[in-house]
Structures are given as structure tokens and as C-alpha cells.
Amino acid sequence: MKKSVKVVLGIETSCDETAVAIVNSNKEVLSHKILSQKEHAEYGGVVPEIASRAHINYLYDLTVSCIEESQLSLNNIDAVAVTSGPGLIGGLIVGVMIAKGIASVTGKPIIEINHLEAHALIVRMFYEINFPFLLLIISGGHCQFLIVYNVGCYHKLGSSLDDSLGEVFDKVAKMLNLGYPGGPVIEKKSLSGDSKSFVLPRALTGRCGCDFSFSGLKTAVRNIIMNHEYIDNKLICDISASFQECVGDILVNRINNAIAMSKAIDKRIDKLVVTGGVAANKLLRERMLRCASDNNFEIFYPPSKLCTDNGIMIGWAGIENLVKDYVSNLDFAPKARWPLESLRSNIMKE
């Protein structure tokens, strides 16, 4: 391996996935290990205490296995990248402590990674996407539009005023007794349903801006369920289809507004990147693709398996930061909240 090629170990423990990966600056994945904690399914959502203990139990062995699979040693690693926030603080502490231990023992640089930045940058591992671009993050914890000017340089255009979109998928699935996580099963059920069965509220779509509000949609679904004495599979499919159709309409409306806002700020912007767990939904992808095309925008998604949390995106974000010499001191602390727009705000917009 040429010396100019950078190799980064990435560690992700912000929620209920324990993940480790080794990637390089040639955009190659040398190893990737991920363990999705099934313990949360019976609770219909992530239990922070259970997640933290699972990371403690699994992360060390997963890291060793990842290094062995890559056929490298720690001496071949140029830096350690670790999610430092935002996320569940217990899990973040576990990942950060392991990463700091590796960095301390090896003398390698450590890079604290903003989890949302990792979602934002992972598409650049697969496509040639130059800055600036418009970003939509739709995940279990976040729902927001940002302009990405560079690594570490973001400008927020809008966000959810209440629930994140992924959270609403999970809560609707829980109401319908479909299990956790809710996104994949609602998408599957919607294929057999009638999307015109129920009229659901499309909050804020009559207004300018690109903020979201999903609390009314969640309440409307709950009311429909409560008004039916018997919940059969047909009703579940119809509710799922109507819900997903409503979400698609909201996304299209908000994307139209966000594109107009981004172009007014910077005329160079002609690309939309959509990432986060909800971005794996095929039907919503099709809706957003048509919307972007109607606005003469190119749209990009990460591979579906990398829309949800993973170690590859942390490793790649580490590469993006390392090539700019953005490394961290060992005394940083994990952060439950860490807005993207607060990163290196003094970087010049190139």
C-alpha cells in the first residue's frame, strides 16, 4: 500500500448499532463489522441503558475482529475516528473511551466525528460530489435541510419543529403492532394498501420555508386506529399506504422550498444529497427523485445499507477530516447534542 494512502479506523456507537470499519482514502472498505442490537424490539424503541451495556459487551471484540479481517495491524492505521455526538450519551462514552485507548496506545491521531457529518459526507465515497450541495437528513433522530459548504462548514435552512421522520415511522409502526424498527415494515405493508383510504394532515405545506412538523400526522394516525374496533391486515396496509403517501407529499413540498432557498443563497448549488435511515425507503426515493428532476437538480443517496448507522461512514468522515489536518486532542468529551452548523464556523466558504 502506498504511503500516501490514508487508512482510518471508524467507530460508531451513537444509538443501537455497534459498528467498526476500516476504510482508506482510495475509497476502499478494508473491513466492516456491525451488530444491530435486537434487544430493543420488544420495547418498540431504543432503551438507552440497554444500548450502552450492549456497546460495552460487543465493541472490543468487534474492533479486534474488524482489524483481523482487514489483515492490517494498528501500526498500519493512520488515525482513529469515533462518533462523539450527537446521540445517546452512554453509548457515545463507550465508543469514545475505546477510541481514546487505541489512540493513546498507538500514538495515532484521534478524530472526533459529528454523527450527522458522517451521514452528510458518506455519498462522497461513492460519487464525485463537489461542494457546495444541499443536504436533507431524514433519520430516527434528525430531520433537517442544510447547505454543505465544506467539511465542517454547514448552514441550516430548516428542521423539524417536533418529531423526526424516522421517529414517526417507528411510532406509527408501534401503534399498528408492527414491531421495531418501523420504517421497513411500513414500507412493505404500504405496497398492499390503498394510499387514498385516509386523508392525513400535511402540516406546513401551505407555508414558505422548509421546516417540518409531524406531530399532527402522528396524532391523526392514532385517531384512525382508535376509531376502528378491529384492526385487520387490510386496515394496516391502507393506513401504511396513506401515511407513506402523506410523508411523500410533505417531503416533495419541503424539497421544492429548500431548493429555491438554497439557489437564492448560492447559485452554484445544483445537487441534493438525501441521507439517514428513512432515505433507504424506495418509494420515498422515487418521489424525491422526480421532485429533484423537476427542479433540474441531481439527487444522490448513499447505498441503502449505509443510510442507517454504520462504521464505514465514520471512517470515511475521518478520511475527509484527516486530509484537511482536522484532528482532535485527547481531552474532548462526547456530546448528546452537537448541531452540525456549530462545526468550525470560521472556515471560509470556498
From Swiss-Prot:
Cofactor binding description: Binds 1 Fe(2+) ion per subunit.
Reactions catalysed according to its record: L-threonylcarbamoyladenylate + adenosine(37) in tRNA = N(6)-L-threonylcarbamoyladenosine(37) in tRNA + AMP + H(+)
Residues binding substrate: I137, I138, S139, G140, G141, D170, G183, N281
Top EC group: transferase
Cellular component terms (Gene Ontology): cytoplasm
Subcellular localization, as worded in the UniProt entry: Cytoplasm
Cofactor needs: Fe(2+)
Task performed by this protein: Required for the formation of a threonylcarbamoyl group on adenosine at position 37 (t(6)A37) in tRNAs that read codons beginning with adenine. Is involved in the transfer of the threonylcarbamoyl moiety of threonylcarbamoyl-AMP (TC-AMP) to the N6 group of A37, together with TsaE and TsaB. TsaD likely plays a direct catalytic role in this reaction.
Protein family: Belongs to the KAE1 / TsaD family.
Name of this chain's protein: tRNA N6-adenosine threonylcarbamoyltransferase
Species assigned in the record: Ehrlichia canis (strain Jake)
